[in-house]
Amino acid sequence: MYAVIKTGGKQYRVQAGDLLVVEKLEGEPGAAVAFGEVLMLGEGEAVTVGAPTVDGAVVSGTLLETRKGEKVKIFKKIRRQGYRRTRGHRQFESVVRVTSVAGAGKEAKWEGTIDLTPKVILDARARGLGDAAVPATIPAPVEAAPAKAEAAPKKKAAPKKAAAKTEEGEA
């Protein structure tokens, strides 16, 4: 069973178990996400098209991570003027695992397990360092710094020097 959903101004065709990269969604990793704007449901030859959405249909998922996407380069140029500017921008995106597609009295569920292992640990395992090296690589949560002691008074500015006098007798 598949569905066509709309989120972030874009449409996606999804099935249970799919990994979906969408515009940024609010929530922590592991949070449940529901997409209620289902435009179409399909199973084999049977297709249900909504007008504009299918009533009672919902696609559920789990938020895996929120990250920055690929960099988009912005290049401005005015020819023959020596004017060139390059900037870049990375949009936030969320990765969602679709866990179920439900509607029209039917439901398709994904039977897998969701692993929320941080990327740092996965990278260490891939390099063959094992889990023993991982705790040293994960940064500890930053606590608020203690308030600074009373700041020293600022120094006074040095007095300005008098302008040098010139002799007016020579012309």
From Swiss-Prot:
Similarity comment text for this entry: Belongs to the bacterial ribosomal protein bL21 family.
Residue stretches of biased makeup (Basic residues): 154-163
Phosphoprotein in keyword set: no
Transmembrane segments: none
One Pfam family recorded for the sequence: Ribosomal_L21p
Self-association state and partner proteins as the record states: Part of the 50S ribosomal subunit. Contacts protein L20.
Region: Disordered, residue numbers: 144-171
Superkingdom in the source lineage: Bacteria
Coiled coil: none
InterPro entries to which the protein is assigned, alphabetical: bL21-like, bL21-like_sf, Ribosomal_bL21
Keyword annotations from UniProtKB, A to Z: Ribonucleoprotein, Ribosomal protein, RNA-binding, rRNA-binding
Name of this protein: Large ribosomal subunit protein bL21
SUPFAM superfamilies referenced in this protein's UniProt entry, alphabetically: L21p-like
Species of origin: Caulobacter vibrioides (strain ATCC 19089 / CIP 103742 / CB 15)
Purpose: This protein binds to 23S rRNA in the presence of protein L20.
GO molecular function: rRNA binding; structural constituent of ribosome
Record keyword Heme present: no
Biological processes per GO annotation: translation
GO CC terms in record: cytoplasm; ribonucleoprotein complex; ribosome
